[in-house]
Amino acid sequence: MSDSAARPTFLFHDYETFGTHPALDRPAQFAAIRTDDEFNIIGEPEVFYCKPADDYLPQPGAVMVTGITPQEAREKGVNEAEFARRIHDLFTVPNTCVVGYNNIRFDDEVTRNVFYRNFYDPYAWSWQNRNSRWDLLDIMRACYALRPEGINWPENEEGLTSFRLEHLTRANGIEHSNAHDAMADVYATIAMAKLVKNAQPRLFEYLLSHRSKQKLMTLIDVPQMKPLVHISGMFGAWRGNTSWVAPLAWHPDNRNAVIMVDLAGDISPLLELDSDSLRERLYTPKNELGDLPAVPVKLVHINKCPVLAQANTLRPEDADRLGINRQHCLDNLKVLRENPQVREKVVAIFAEAEPFVPSENVDAQLYNGFFSDADRAAMNIVLQTEPRNLPALDITFADKRIEKLMFNYRARNFPGTLDEAEQDRWLQHRRNVFTQEFLNSYAQELEMLYSQYEGNAEKQALLKSLFQYAQEIV
């Protein structure tokens, strides 16, 4: 079958990780299943583990959640270079839509960083060869807000609707016995996709077709400030993660971001304050604002599959159910249209946004910039070179990050290729990571959790494993 004829497929996937930071923590386990466009499973389930390198210790809290120890990952896993290659092979099958649950904010960032550390293009998998990505978390939020019929919506302890995968599966009678095992979460995500597709087929098809930025662009009319309904976790569960918004302007530097006003908010700051005061207030944490109204502005990134729809998609009875005051939103829209000078103010907020302070650590430098075509081509040569021949590889890179990435890549994945001077350099790097201060606070955290889980033999065994692992590698 030629690429052009490749049937569209969904690749449902999930990572379990050794910590919450996509760049500085490491993956533990990856799972994926390919389905056809009706969500029938068509491929073998893929599950593999990643061996942690010897310059990293897992976050204890993450191991408490996943139950995966570094010893288990080391025993069952492949090195990160091989781990990245396997994932890249799955993700780059033409016409694949890579889908997960909260993947836009988390798993996709893990993928980008794994690919960045291992010389694969961090972005191409999600757009080349008619590929795309999609996130079921916002689909569930949209379904609850816009068309809730046909699905049971569980509540959390605070009485708010819960969108945690394990809560939704339980409420809807879906088998999900081993939450936080990557494969169990993948099966659960497929089941949720089927549930929404069957309960609300029109909404489902609409959201699926509007996952691309090209399609979303057709909804956004900045000159008219055309109102839209927008679903986002940023709005908070207390109003169903939903509001009516209007586009004020495109972001001055990021062509994938549109500056939206939350019409349900208090727009007085936009009218009364200058751009410097607005910027300061926008970047002040909510809990420090006191009685001051927040700036009701948010960026919507059209390359992150945001949920946007025509304003009338939010029916009056659903707006009432979510506690959204339609008249207040309409009044705000009228005022904003009468005060177009607000547009320049909000553009000015973002034209001099918070400065991006680059990290000294190359692992955290993915977003410092794109690699040139020449560097990309050179990185492909690295991937095609036998590990044992890497030391003799004579290529120069323009981007300063790549030499450091290359050294880390060899030291973490192929330590046998380091000469004596390089081994000393790596040892020094590990000493810089595992300072006495770091190790003391790590031991303290393990002790604190150990007493917290008194009487829980399973959790305490995990903590003992972490303590042993730290002693082994440091």
Label the predicted regions.
Residues 16-20, 47, 86-87, 244-247:
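Short secondary-structure capping/turn segments at boundaries of alpha-helices and beta-strands
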Residues 198, 209-289:
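Acidic catalytic cores of enzymes that act on phosphate-bearing nucleotides/polynucleotides
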Residues 25-28, 34-35, 40-68, 89-201, ...:
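Metal-dependent phosphoesterase core characteristic of DEDDh/y 3'-5' exonuclease domains
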Residues 422-474:
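C-terminal non-catalytic accessory extensions
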Residues 1-40:
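Entry/capping segment at the start of metal-dependent catalytic domains
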Residues 252-429:
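Long, charge-rich C-terminal accessory regions
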Residues 66-83, 90:
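Metal-dependent phosphoesterase signature
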Residues 18-20, 73, 179:
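Short strand->helix junction
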